[in-house]
Amino acid sequence: TAYDDALFDYHMSSELLLVDPAGGRTQTIGETAHYTMAEFSPDGAYLLIERLVGPWSHEVAWWRFASEVEVWSPDGQLVASIASLPLADAVPIHGVPLGPRVIDWRSTAPHTLFWVEALDGGNPVASVSHRDRLMKLEAPFDGEATEIFRAEHRIISTGAWTDDGATLMLTERERIKRWRYVWLIDVETGESKVWYDLDEDDRYNDPGNPVYRPLDNGHWVLRQKGDMVYFRGSGASPEGDRPFLDRRELGGSATERLFRCDPDRYEYFNAFAGDENHFVFRSESS
């Protein structure tokens, strides 16, 4: 109803403010809108914005509404339009919308955007050689985006950057077999290799998820020590979950277990305390 539309307008409307943490001064950026994303580039020179645009559909959830993805200057001036995404009300079951998705800054570059695009029309049953591709666009965002990588299956994760700055950890998923392939991609040269693969249903052999650390620019990279990166997991076993912390060779197969919870209590890695030689874990017992 019109009342539902008015409620959505009211609850989704927001303003963007820059806040000086020292003095508490604030500065409004842009106009009031229905923002779903506002993220500065690593060097602070640009702002990545996504805002919903009406009319509002009563058939799909809000994250399928039409939206505009833009790059602004820090004072709210439009620099470039990245994508005008239409209402996604005809997405196939298990499919994805058309156009750029998972749009984000490269954590280890001043101002470079990456995103994923479907090559199969978003239709998971379409017969194609590749389903997705990874795209790159650098400032000033007025040229054509560059294709970096083509995936045979659907890309489901692209947010893990290594300390060296040029390597992206990307995950693609084979839907029918419920299988995942984890790639390492050099986004400067385009070189890529499968690091490891896993069965989604084999919880006993699940290697877990990467541990991250924040950069001074507010973005995140993999927690890394030399050629080793850190993984944490729930540690499913016949005795129940026994969470663990591992150190894995980046691009290789060597793994070192640093911690695993005892079977008579429940413990899990929480965070590193300073360097990689100390960490905090939580312990629970009955």
PLM regions and their residue ranges:
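Beta-propeller folds
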Residues: T1-S286
